[in-house]
């Protein structure tokens, strides 16, 4: 990636990390108290960009940082099981510009936010990879992947300087196994041309994103090759499914 593009991606990531995404949980039920405690949310709506209004049936999400306000079904679960489902549903309702800030401020949201960032970038790169212009896709895809890696880093609370950003990209965006991924794709993808390129673009982005998430969850420990192979295999399966849906729309 050129220095100009690198600086642009770095600046965008810094700006995203500076947003505010304070979350409030309202309601008088024991369920509201439990959810607020699980999320680490405040109980007052004052200054909140995300508001979860709890009721017996579920929750209603609204606020400045919410792109898709409305009802969120509340699973009949407790503790971690409730948290895992609720965070995914909240994240899917959020404005993309506030995701990094939400994860940075509220650790329970980190996994769901980083998965959403990964999938968003993978979908974009799959569409770019399907364009019939050889070589024109690489600068855009590379910039998307760099942005994804740095946004995941910011979501985990990394204070990014330009030097730190370069270091992370060298460690996480390089050598994650694109050649191995391409070899696996030949065996698993039953179609060629633009569709195969789109699958590899999607899967490569997902594999990079998932390995980056694990890197930060494990305190800076890189994923081993055996585990990376499994990540690539699953990413290819997801990529194949996504591109199959694209092909049906064309």
Language-model features: where?
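Membrane-inserting effector segments that mediate pore formation, membrane fusion
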Residues: 116-210
């Amino acid at each position: 990636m050129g220095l100009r593009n690198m600086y642009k991606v770095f600046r965008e990531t810094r700006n995203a990390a500076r947003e505010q995404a304070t979350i409030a949980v309202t309601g008088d039920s024991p369920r509201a108290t439990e959810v607020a405690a699980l999320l680490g949310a405040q109980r007052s709506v004052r200054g909140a960009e995300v508001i979860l209004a709890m009721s017996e049936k579920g929750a209603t999400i609204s606020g400045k940082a919410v792109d898709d306000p409305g009802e969120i079904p509340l699973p009949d679960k407790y503790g971690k099981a409730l948290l895992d489902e609720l965070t995914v549903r909240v994240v899917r309702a959020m404005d993309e510009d506030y995701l990094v800030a939400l994860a940075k401020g509220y650790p329970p949201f980190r996994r769901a936010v980083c998965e959403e960032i990964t999938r968003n970038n993978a979908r974009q790169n799959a569409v770019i990879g399907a364009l019939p212009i050889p070589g024109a896709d690489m600068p855009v895809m590379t910039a998307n992947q760099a942005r994804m890696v740095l946004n995941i880093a910011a979501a985990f609370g990394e204070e990014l300087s330009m030097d730190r950003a370069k270091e992370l990209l060298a460690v996480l965006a390089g050598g994650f196994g694109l050649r191995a991924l391409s070899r696996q794709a030949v065996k698993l993808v039953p179609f060629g041309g633009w569709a195969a390129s789109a699958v590899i673009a999607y899967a490569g982005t997902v594999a990079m994103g998932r390995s980056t998430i694990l890197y930060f969850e494990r305190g800076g420990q890189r994923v081993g090759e055996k585990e990376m192979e499994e990540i690539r295999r699953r990413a290819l399966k997801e990529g194949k499914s996504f591109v199959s849906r694209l092909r049906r729309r064309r």
